Amino acid sequence: MIKRPRRLRTNEVLRKAVRETRLSTDSLIWPLFIVEGKNIKKEISSLPGQYHFSPDMVGKAIEAALKADVKSVLLFGLPKHKDEKGSEAYNENGVLQQGIREIKQRYPQMQVITDICMCEYTSHGHCGILEGERVDNDRTLPYLEKIALSHVMAGADMIAPSDMMDGRIYALRSTLDKNGFTDIPIMSYAVKYASSFYGPFREAA
């Protein structure tokens, strides 16, 4: 597989985000949680000052981000319908896909990164397809590919897989390249910390 570091040099926002260590708003990414419905801006009790937004209200968060000179957001979707295969995750009209389109149509300068996982979308809450009582790693990969492709086709600038499936990066990169999205970067979730911060996140997502 060809390595393409040029992906990280395609625009000024991205170049500033990945350059050598420098403390500035260029390096900040604001996580946003998109829920189904209309006219929703509901505070997340475990994360004071953070909110669930419906797609039609997410513009308020983007305007606040841009005012604070934050140029990147990381989107998480929270659908009402969940099933064993997390089908809303790759629905072209799903809640996250709606949120992506809303942001990119109104604020094209905002860099939109999307979380690639299934736990928010599956009825059992696991990050993949279950086979009995275990997650079937290899059966899950094609679903992650569909999720990533649906996000990028909706307008996402970058994807960030958090699913922990073996082989996912090769699968996602191959699918993006095969469909003409060779310039879409994949952001690593490689560094994670044992922390109490994960508890509040689980309520948010």
Swiss-Prot record:
It catalyses: 2 5-aminolevulinate = porphobilinogen + 2 H2O + H(+). Keywords: Heme biosynthesis, Lyase, Metal-binding, Porphyrin biosynthesis, Zinc. Its cofactor is Zn(2+). Its EC number is 4.2.1.24. Transmembrane segments: none annotated. InterPro entries: ALAD (IPR001731), Aldolase_TIM (IPR013785). GO terms for biological process: protoporphyrinogen IX biosynthetic process. It comes from Ruminiclostridium josui (Clostridium josui). Zn(2+) binds at C117, C119, C127. The keyword Zinc applies. Pathway: Porphyrin-containing compound metabolism; protoporphyrin-IX biosynthesis; coproporphyrinogen-III from 5-aminolevulinate: step 1/4. This is Delta-aminolevulinic acid dehydratase. The keyword Amino-acid biosynthesis does not apply.
